[in-house]
Amino acid sequence: MNSDTFRHFYNYHFTENRKLWDSFIVPLSYDQFIQPESYSHGSLRDQIVHLMDVDEVWFCELRGVAPSEALPAADFDDRQVIRARWDNIEQMMRAYLAGLTDEMLDTRPITDPEEDKELIVWQVLLHVANHGTDHRAQLLRLLHDLGVKTQGQDYIFYVYDNL
């Protein structure tokens, strides 16, 4: 793998996040959006806040900066506020990826927390992308349970659409 591969795969990550938001989250009623769930991190809102918080924390660690304080999902009562924060996180991630070089992939830039110090950049990048796929799948399941007709998020379909 090289830095271009990661930029490509993260374009998929961002595209699927946005597709999920625009196609399925925006049309929901407020009550559906915050409906409590016992599955995983809870409501659709809570899942999305978790997904964007994890993206932010890991990319801040890679950049050597402290992440913003994670706010409880209940503090994100407005979808426009969530979308604005998510857009800012995506832009921060894109900026990091734009500067990513092949040489950086095998470095260990994380200094805190202790348990993350031995992680290599490419491992963190794979983890974050995989985490996103996992939580989008969980979101799709919650949407399905609400009766929403969803679609797959297979990487190969992204490839076909971008050949």
Task: Name these PLM-found stretches.
Residues D78-N88, D102-L105, V121-H127, Y158-N162:
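Short alpha-helical interface patches
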Residues A98-E114:
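Acidic catalytic patch
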